[in-house]
């Protein structure tokens, strides 16, 4: 196992250790034990920067199921390293922050188990080269985020937000699964790098469009793009460390990673470019507009996160244009990839810090309601300083890093509008227009975020707590991120050669080696647009109280949340009514529906699909086999007319023993012995329970009722016969029995084929079947024990009386 594999599974291994630490070290905050895990991973990832800077990659394989093409393959290039550094670096700061945020009275064992589970899953997503393994980790991120969002499960809003996020992201995960399967069909491989190398085969495949649509749905749901963004605001019910980690730097970036990783395969399609770009721009505009009307600090940050993700998504779409050009023209459009990567880093820094400051304000005052907040400038000066730095970066104000990436974004929109790629050239001018409008509202909500908390009148009578500056543990992590905001803004070269260029080269087919960011480029369209953004933004802030009321009057039926909630209520109710219409408490009626459907399906298939019934290879029927079958049928027939339960038990046993004899005739002594033992044990159990069973009652059933039963029973028997004959006479594949005959000894080192199949080739089936029996036995034992306990308690009460 390589160090890269260890880095991925280290958080998952530590999940198993946390319960022990939580059990024996309750006096020490559990976060101190967890903190070294992301720090170690981050340091290891830093050592790999030289590898990716030189244009090399790391490929490590761990065999899992090689016969099925599913191995634990890890591939690290510039893009994977970037995300790994974000996951582990921001993860370290979040764990440190959580030590000050979460009290030791909280269920810290659960919290850190969920957090490390998510961390390991995210590392698996960004480093997996096998798409099936990527999908497994992808779904694990959805599952672990569900657990984190619902951490305060006593709150109904937390449960609602967790369920909502799970439903939408799992829907996207299923779409992703369909897409990667369609990708694997033309390439006959699950390797992402192999698919990229053979992208032309995928592009010529009839499944290309369907795979592209399904993968885009998977990415859009994960990264909260329009119209799937509705889960992210409700996910803000999670503890603030979760929001700072999942919803600023990691989980919501998984969709962006998927789009970036799949760009070399799908960039040849103009549909990919248009869809990714427009969805990103629409998300940017819609979310930034909605962020301005939020009354909750986390609500503002939630919609701002959606907005910023839309900006990055749009840049990834514009960058895909570079695949349609060569030379310098290609590099012009590939600059959009560079801008996307840079803003992805910047967003993680300023948004992570803003989430942490929001948690600090909530921790200090007991509320996040902007109507109750204000005037905290002198009370929380350190928090104010951090907020100003990071919020201005989000607004795109120099000299912070957000200004550089926002300028790069505007440049890419103007560049895209001039591309001769699209059939309708005028639509290209929508790109800079939407980008500018979205940036105006971004400027507004960023400045208002500062004003809501620190300016205005201080209202202590409306605050649940007396406001105070929070502890150093809660300030250290956002302070580090705020410092990075300044450093990356003033010295972007720190990132360009080491992180941004290798990551961009991983997406683009052209090597990017001349990335530069400057505060001032001259009077370019992007710079002039920035001035327009500042002017319009200030005007909107001055008139904020007038126009925001119009947004807050938006009819509920025009929101996606309304239709989601309506569907969430209507679908279960309709399903329940439909189920109750045919499912009853009478098992006989339920069996009639099930068996009737089987009979109908069998006969429809018989009369609609051509088939052959071949009797050439059928073995001859011997007289003693006929005698046993007659005995078996007679015993089964007599059960219908039995008047005592004991007679029923004897006849059922006769049927079982007759089957055992047939197994002997068919040269399967192991099956015969097994059947004989099972029948003997079941008969003995029946007889032991016989004494406790009530008397057998006979009911006078109507003739039509009996006729229906007879028709259903006869139809099922006939269906089974027909299915058996069709299966025997229409073998489209070679029998698997030959495989067992050839490999029973070589692979399993056994001579008894039946035993080897049960305990080796199908060992997992046998294991789970045994587990089910064991669980059922424990359940019966528990119910009997509880019943005896209640009887004993009842007797004691009577004696006491």
Curated annotation (Swiss-Prot):
The keyword Cell membrane applies. GO terms for biological process: proton transmembrane transport; sodium ion transport. It is a multi-pass membrane protein. Keywords: Antiport, Cell membrane, Hydrogen ion transport, Ion transport, Membrane, Sodium, Sodium transport, Transmembrane, Transmembrane helix, Transport. The chain crosses the membrane at residues 1-21, 28-48, 79-99, 117-137, 166-186, 206-226, 265-285, 300-320, 337-357, 373-393, 427-447, 472-492, 522-542, 591-611, 623-643, 646-666, 671-691, 707-727, 764-784. GO terms for molecular function: antiporter activity. It is found in: Cell membrane. May form a heterooligomeric complex that consists of seven subunits: mnhA1, mnhB1, mnhC1, mnhD1, mnhE1, mnhF1 and mnhG1. Belongs to the CPA3 antiporters (TC 2.A.63) subunit A family. This is Na(+)/H(+) antiporter subunit A1. It comes from Staphylococcus aureus (strain bovine RF122 / ET3-1). The gene is mnhA1.
